[in-house]
Amino acid sequence: MKKNLLRFVLPIIMVVLLSSFAWHKFYVSVTQIDYVPNKKRIEITHRIFIDDLEKAFEKKYKKKVYLTSTKELSDAETLIKNYLKENIKISINKKPQEIVYLAREVEGDVLIFYTKIAISKKINTFEIFNSLLTNVYSEQQNIVHVNINSNK
């Protein structure tokens, strides 16, 4: 009798417990920054989920951009450049730097952006401001990996 009761009650308890947890999406972007001395530049790679970026653009520009699809807006590249410029700021030796947009590519449901900064002097201090997607998601986390002068 106890065995039969357990077979009946245990699945019900499991369903109730598991259904009390709501699925929550993880909001994250990853930025990799590498100083390449022989090229005298800093190379920057940003990885951002396509749907998150589209939502940010829709909120900011009040229109659907349809990134990476056949419906992508003709000015999408300009919107991307402007968005990155507004949300990523880097200072080296206490001086703001110009970040040059190079290209983008798609990897699954992630957009990868490539940018660079030309460097002519030794890097003594490095500061970054990264506010990607923070205007859309309060839970947004922007992870930044930095490798400069062999310091991580």
Describe the function of each predicted region.
Residues 23-152:
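N-terminal soluble domains immediately following signal/targeting peptides that reside
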Residues 1-26:
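Bacterial Sec-dependent N-terminal signal peptides
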